[in-house]
A protein has these predicted regions:
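Hydrophobic pocket/interface hotspot
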Residues: 30, 41-42, 50, 98, ...
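A short gly/proline-enriched turn/hairpin at secondary-structure junctions
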Residues: 46-61, 76
Length: 143
């Protein structure tokens, strides 16, 4: 019940999806899947392979789910993430780039970290999928 209340609260803070482009709405949905720790939905919402660039290191994962370790994230104190800024930088028929500023929070709603990430989206059969994440600075997915 606590997690359901948290998800509903977070949903109320996000921008109205009718105000967002399709790639921006896909980013919002991706964060909802992340907060729900729904690896299957995260994999379905991302391209393969998934490229993660952070702290000067570029890693290629077969799927987004392979890059994640929710247990390690929770051990670091992570309880949920919230988007603060969701800005479309570029979009054509096949690709888009979205600049996201977000924070990770602990269970007391204290900020653990705030990050800026540019996500590259690809349009596959009408669905926008996150293909790559370019982090300004350091950020971990738990691995």
């Amino acid at each position: 019940m606590k997690h359901l209340s948290l998800i509903l609260l977070l949903a109320s803070f996000t921008a109205n999806s009718s105000d967002l482009s399709a790639p921006q709405a896909a980013a919002e949905k991706f964060f909802r899947y992340f907060n729900a720790k729904d690896i299957e939905s995260l994999n379905n919402a991302s391209g393969r392979p998934f490229i993660f660039a952070a702290g000067g290191e570029v890693i290629r994962w077969n799927s987004y789910g392979e890059a994640l370790d929710f247990e390690a994230l929770e051990e670091s104190g992570w309880a949920y993430s919230r988007i603060h800024q969701n800005e479309l930088i570029y979009k054509d028929d096949m690709t888009a780039m979205v600049d996201i500023n977000f924070s990770r929070y602990d269970s007391t709603d204290a900020v653990i970290t705030t990050s800026d990430v540019i996500y590259l989206f690809v349009n596959r059969d009408g669905a926008w999928k996150i293909k790559s994440a370019f982090v300004k600075g350091n950020l971990t997915l738990g691995r």
